[in-house]
Amino acid sequence: MLRTILLMSWVGLITTNMVASVKVEKTEYKGWQNCYRVTNGEIELIVTGDVGPRIIRFGFVGGQNMFKEFAEQLGKSGEEKFQLRGGDRVWKAPEDPVATWAPDNVPVQIIPTATGLIARAPIEPLTNLQKEIEIAIAPSGTTVTVSHRITNHSLFTLEFAPWALTMMAQGGIAVSGFPPRGRHPINLEATNPLVMWAYTDLADPRWKFTKKYLTLRQDPNNKEAQKLGLFNPDTWAAYLLNGEAFVKRTKADASKTYPDFGCSFETFTNNEFLEIETLGPLTKLSPGHTVEQVEHWGLYRKVQPTELTDQELDRVLLPLVQATGGAE
């Protein structure tokens, strides 16, 4: 209790000139005794301290969690193998069944900041990488900047990309934008990739394509995995769930090489969750250096497109993408 009071007092002193107070408080969450709640009074995030780094909850205060939670994995720690658990995490890409899936089942260091916190994991024995997530919540409103970082503590230069994965709750629809479209015969050269995996089935009814958008519906009754990737200099995705929308946005650099045949965005689903993922460029990272993937998040109410058409998604979602920020 004393530690919670000190944390809140320290953060409050720094943020006295802000429009609204950013609070960081230690709390119990679904069996974990060492979680941290970051809030500005309107939205809140819960970060695990016993495992991770993970953002296990994001939602309006008192509202639904937009993120997936695996109930049977909550409140636990110390497992030998990687646990999905739910929420938002940082990985290395391309995906490797051993190094990418390194366990994150031990306590993390929590460092309060003026606008949130940093959750920093210890160095992974398997990879000699150290992962951290920093949350910077707006003092008012419903936007957050989330920085996903990986530091190379090995003796060698390693090449990989930072990969920010957000697991969404069941029953929603993901929407992502394609890059600006052109016209034939003016634009004759290929412009951007649409990447398949070996298990991708474009005949699956959960997919829907329009000229400007890719949508994927999460179906709790369909256990078949689906995944696609794409590149967009203005990478963004939205997840629509029960009248609310989660938006994440980042910038991608077309002059750099991205993993998985050039993907800055990927989306995956099965019967348990849907994932929206952004990727940074492949980087040759020297010992002691850090790479990061910065995302801008927004949360919005009363978002209910009447149909998944270009015109309706333009009307409903594009203003929210702009409001989320990250266009610079």
Task: List where the protein language model places each region.
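Terminal connector regions
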Residues: L299-E328
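Acidic-aromatic substrate-binding/catalytic surfaces of carbohydrate-active enzymes
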Residues: C35-P103, K256
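A contiguous, surface-exposed recognition patch within enzymatic or periplasmic domains that forms
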Residues: I43-L45, V51-R57, N65, H153-A161, ...
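Short Pro-Gly-centered flexible turn/kink motifs
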Residues: G41, I110, T283-R301
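Bacterial N-terminal signal peptides
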Residues: I5-T16
